[in-house]
Each structure stands twice: as C-alpha cells, then as structure tokens.
Amino acid sequence: MKLSISALFCVATAVMPVLGETFTNPVLWEDLADLDIFRVDDTFYYSASNMHYSPAAPILSSKDLVNWEYIGHSVPSLDFGSKYDMANGETAYVKGIYASTMRYRASNKTWYWYGCIEYTGTYVYTAPSAAGPWTQAAKISQCYYDAGLLIDEDDDTMYVAYGNTELSVAKLSSDGLSQSQAQVVYNTPSSIGTLEGSRMYKKDGAYYIFVTRPANGQYVLKSTSGPFGPYEIKELLLNLGSPIPNGGVPHQGGLVDTPNGDWFYMAFIDSYPGGRVPTLAPITWGSDGFPALELVNNAWGVSYTAPLPLTPVSHTGTDNFSGTELGPQWEWNHNPDTTKFSVSDGLTLNTATVTDDLYHARNTLSHRILGPTSSGTFVLDISSMADGDRAGVAALRDSSAWIGVLKDGDTTTLSMYSGLTMTSSWATSSTGSEVASADFSGTKVWLRIYADINVGTGKQAEFYYSTDGEAFTKMGSLEMGNQWEFFIGYRYAVFNFATKALGGSVVVEEFTVDAPGKTTEG
C-alpha cells in the first residue's frame, strides 16, 4: 500500500529528533527561488517566487531549517490582468511573482506579503494565518523591486528595502498598507556592479540590508545611524564554490536566527535544468558587526551540523487527490478556469481550451521535479475523453515534450510529442510533432516521466506508459535545456485540452513521486 503525501507528512512528524546530526545541501532539491526566510517562535517560514504559476508565492514551513513542508500561497490568484487567464490568445510567461517578501506582525497578529508586479506597483496581501486565507489588502503605487520587509522590533515600524543598483528604504504607514516616506540609501559603485534582492534586518540596534550581486556575489549594508543610513558595505561572498556539482554560486536569499541564537544563511543556487534550489550554511557575527559565512575548504559546504534536531519530511509518495482541494504543492500554469476542474477522490480535468498548443492550454497542473533524479507517475482514467481531445503529462518549460492519449473519433492512440518550443519573448514557436505512437484500447493509463535534473547539459527526461501499472514501456526522451532565461525550472505537468470542442474530461486518480526514480522497461 502506498501512503498519501499527507500521510507521509504525518509519519514524518512522529519521528524522534536526533541531536548532533548533519544535513546535506541542497536542503530541498526543488525549484524555490528568490526566497525570503524568517522565524516565528519555533517555526521557520520560507516564501518563494513562482512567476506565472497559480496560486502564487508558495509558502513552506519547517521546525529545523532543513526539512520543509508546503503549507500554502500568499497570492491565491494572479489577478493582474487577463493575460494571466490566457485570455484573448495572450499569456504571462516569465511575468507575475518575482522576488517578494513575507513577515508576521505580532502586534496585530497579521501576516503580510509584498510584491511588485510588472513594475506597475506593489501588491500587499494579508492573512490571519500563514496558511491563509490570504486576501489583497492594498496596492502601493511605488514598485518595491525585490522587496525586503522589516518590522522593527523596538517600535513596530514597518520598513521595506528595495531597488536595483540604486537601493532605497521606504517607511510604511502604521497599518503597513501605504507609504509614509522613502529615500535612496545607497548607490552601488561601478566596481561592484549591480546589487538587488534586498532583505532588511535589525540586530543589536544596527540596520542591515542584505543584497545580491547576481548571480555570483552577496553583500551586506550596515547602518548604526538608523534605517535611512548612511550605510557601509562589506562583501560576504564572491565567486564561491558550490555544494552542487556544476551548480552556480550560492546567492540571494536571507538570514535567519534559531531560538538558540544561532544564525544561518539560506541562499539559492542556479541548478538548471531543475531551477534554483535552496542551500543552507551557518553564519557568525564579527567584532565589526558584519556577518561571516562558515566555509568548508574555502567553499560553501556540502554538509554541516544541523541547526536543530532534525524531523524528516518526505517529498516522495502518492497523492490520491482525496478531499475537495489540491494540496499546496500543486500549481497551475497561469490561472485556472475553476469551473473546469474538481477534486473529489480524484482530480477531474474537463477540457478548458480548444487549441493545439500546450503552452496555451488552460488548466495544465504542475508539480516541481524532485532532484537530482526522480520520477512522476500519473494514473489517468480516460473513459470520458471526447473526439479531438489530448490528455497527458509533460516535462514543461520553454522547450518541452509530452506523452499522452489522443482521442480521434473512435480511435484512441498513445503518443509522444516533442519539439514544443518558445521564442525568446516566450511566444510559442512550435507546438511540436509526434515522435512515437502506439495503439491503445483501454480506459486507464499510467504515464511516467523520469527526470535527471543534475546540473548541466544533456540531461534527459524519459517518457513511459503502462496499461497495468506494472510493466512500463519507454516511448522516448527529451534533452532538457539548461539555459537560465526562463528562470523557472522544468516541472511535471498534467493536461487535458480539446482540439475540436469542449466537453470531454479525464480523471487523474493519483500521482506518485519516486526517487531516485529510474524506470526500466517492462
């Protein structure tokens, strides 16, 4: 019997913590970029970007800084224009949620999220709990680019550090929903170049702005004269060795302390084709009041002593789509049409779009790929597909492939399509072509993607099908691109779109993640 994802989490919380353990980087090999990290009492919170995926701004929680569990999203829907609904032939690829910030304000027991959307202004979402419900509370006209929120521990004043190269600090109104004042606090010298990705802190009476030089450096600004400076600067790291073979330099992210008073830096590493993944290292504070990173052989360590007793959380297992809502680990490609899906002992996907282009097919549901290698297996009941429908699973990015079922009249075919590509402006350049097919006459199919997202070129996603859930046949493979410009890494995705008329449906009965996940043909 396979445990559900939720059951696995329950098992994890029952494991007895062990003192003196070590952890290995990355702490979670999943695409969770532009992170903000903070602690409330004995729980750590992690907020990330996810661009055009919905719901947006995923939130994770942890008791030990190493094992993380998805708990929700700060932005329930991308309500920033019709293109986020794929309306009128438009899309919002590589737009939406960039680096943003989240904090808890104890004085009014409210959680806050701030993010600038397409440079048009900063949206503010609030909630009574980290898990929600989150609602939009305000829009501030100023774009707080790469915002970092500080709630001053001494007087409860809210500040936001933001900007690119020209770094600013804004003081917010008492309710945090508008701006009281703002000023530039630091102009980056040409000798450093670009600084962005602000996070703002206060420690021992000094104010700090933690900024990145993308994508190979991290700097710290410090002021003992107040939040508006003046600030002095010090390099924390530059061109540092990565704990992931062939991975980028750890950078951006944020600082966090434990209840014991120890400090840590959670950065992310460019790790394509899988995306940008989190990595953790200890921090000490020097006599000059600046933080210093604990290195191993002059590089970011592959492993360190655990910050706290570890309580493992599993990211493998089976989701049976029980209940009436999707778990927070799932995100749609753009906003879904909520009238075209339902969750009740399975996920029913009604066709929501008439198209021949997966990149324009609404209600495509995605799941991050667990690295360095894993497989994702979807079980589909296809008995209610209609003529012209296409249902299947994809390795989804700006260069994609999929395996699925084609329903044409009374004929049902298993097929693999490859060569789905986008232009540099993220418009579809090719809808792909069929590279393999097989006759099929059943009503249930198992579709599996095995993905190797170790960093580098030539990494493969392999596509399999089964008619009984036991013997799997390989239909083809995709060489995944490892360019960074799309930002988001490859994801598993399940879809059902029409090429003729709406009305058909499929039921996704379950989804299983296995790691390392290598499949042999049966």
What is each stretch, according to the model?
Residues M1-E21:
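Fungal secretory targeting signals
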Residues V18-G522:
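Carbohydrate-active catalytic/glycan-binding domains of CAZyme proteins
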